[in-house]
Amino acid sequence: MAQFPEKANVVIIGLGGIVGSSVMHHLVESGWDDIVGIDKTSVPTDIGSTSHASDFCYATDHSKFVCYTTGYSIDFFDKMGHYSRIGGLEVARVGDDDRMMELKRKVASGKAFGTNVKMISAAEAKALFPLLEEDMIQGAMWDPDAGLVKPRSQTVAGILVDNAVKTGQAQSWANTNAIGLDIKDGRIVGVDTSRGYIAAEHVI
């Protein structure tokens, strides 16, 4: 078995989820090397948020940052061949005018931030999702770019890590707990792990 490294340019704590694996992928893609990713469980993780996430991506939000990052993620997964752009509906029941107003505000925010979201009628919502009872809703928000990561974001996380490791620029260490951070002069200079200490120029 390979020896756990004593130093690295970058240490990623929490490699097994979609965020940690994406960080490794993007660092490698940007030319970084000597990257060590660790996770306290398997890679991809079987206990983290990614392992039980819905895998549904919805780009429409009141936050410009959320709209941008989710839109980026959708395009990223799509280019990998791991996205199903099935669209997403949010409905407002008859009599719930506050909900209807909130959906309209959300659509306004989404349009301002570049998404393809729009308001649709109850009949249009019914046509998209026949199980809806048309007379019970007054309208809906429709985002045609919403969809599902396939087969799972957990699977994609594993693919991203595997591809990064194959370049020789990164290492993946599963079942490796981060026990503590070594901080000197306000800067993290290393990580104590269950496999030993690793010095690092950068810790994520």
Model-found features: residue ranges?
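Helical element adjacent to the flavin cofactor pocket in flavoenzyme catalytic cores
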Residues: 142-202
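Short beta-to-alpha linker loops that shape the active-site pocket of alpha/beta-hydrolase fold enzymes
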Residues: 41-43, 125, 160
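Beta1/beta-strand and adjacent pyrophosphate-binding region of the FAD-binding site
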Residues: 2-19, 36
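Short, flexible hinge/linker loops that cap or flank conserved catalytic cores
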Residues: 2-5, 29, 197
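A short, glycine/Asx- and small/polar-enriched loop/turn
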Residues: 129-137, 182-189
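Glycine-rich FAD pyrophosphate-binding loop
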Residues: 28-49
